[in-house]
């Protein structure tokens, strides 16, 4: 009988051990399963985080490419309007620019004696109807006639050279905002009887360079490109006779030189 009792006890102990082992195994399996599920979720999350920046980057690149294509301005086939004083009226550099850049056409509406303030009369919706590029070179007569310079803060209503430039910019933007506006600083010129000549000061103690700097300053303020012929054309006091017929108006060599400078500058501006 004692033997039977011992056997019974052993059976109970073995059963308890078996149940405990099975329970432990099931718990371990559950934890491993949870671990696998957690790892899977973590992997999927990392994939999503990695792909999202790539997708955003692709979208960003598309936007940049689209912006670039919208801003691109092709010079070929465009119509250019040249506004200026007597130096521009009697010159052929505009036609040479047309040939160098393969423009559709060039209209030269320059006149003797024009000053910056008189440009307003040449800028209106009708005059700019078919124009893609407006190119203005004026300032020599303002210098010789002693136009007051004013300050960079002068608006179009102020009677000064700074104010005149701002008024011209405002008029062009209003008449045809999509047209490209470009200013040229005036060329240096030699002795002309009866008027001040570079590098002399005028009757209000201003040099041609002061008017050139004013053009650049106002254009910079308005984000308008400037082709600095005064400093970059290569026409200087010592070689003016080589490039002009009378110390001011351009000869063939002068027109070639100016046309080359303008064409190269326009290509850089609208590259």
Label the model's feature ranges.
Residues 165-169, 212:
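Generic structural signal for well-ordered alpha-helices
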Residues 137, 184-185:
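Alpha/beta-hydrolase-fold catalytic nucleophile elbow
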Residues 103, 175-180:
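A short helix->loop->beta-strand "cap" motif at the edges of active sites that frequently abuts
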